[in-house]
Amino acid sequence: SMGQICFAFSPYSVDIAKGVIIGYTFGPKGWIKGAFPIPDVIYPRERAYSRSKLQMRKRLESLGVTLLNPTLVGKWETHKILMQNIRLRDFLPETKLVKNFSEIGRMLKNYNGVYLKPVAGSQGRNIVKVTKRRASGIYEFWYMSEDRMIKGSASNLTNLQRSLSRVMGNRSYIVQKQINLLKYEGNIIDVRVLVQKDNTGEWDVTGMACRVGS
């Protein structure tokens, strides 16, 4: 009714050289596949962490395309931004960027447990929980691998680092104070809230849901 074409597409279906995108638009009988021109506005629904996707975003922006969602800045930058808000900072668990494993040891002197989270991760992948037994000094850790819970222990930080190298790899990580998590029927849950600006430029809650862990 507005004389505009809306279509969905994968970032891998964009041909910049030809100025064509293979995508799908919704018609009276369902989804229709077709070739479309480079649009004026794109609302990205994917997480553009990979180098190829970031390059595609930059190329589209260089053509004058408006992308409504900026790329995610990562957990560490997000934490620093939230810490600048005096109304929020008291609600944030202590968080440090892991420059070396001694940072984890320092955190465990103050708290019963910590979480290690990849700076550029999502959907709970490669997150590690670490605790330290006060009496023995033994470190215990848990993480998910291919839908299976891996549990282990280490006698010192050097052995802990060696044990976690498989899951952590060369990724940048933050270490965060363990907090008490909400549970439903034994599963951890968290609440996701979608906030968008309305037609007047004011922020409005447009969606809310609970994510239940496995």
Regions found by a protein language model. Give the residues of each.
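Conserved N-proximal alpha/beta basic substrate-recognition cap immediately N-terminal to
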Residues: 3-103
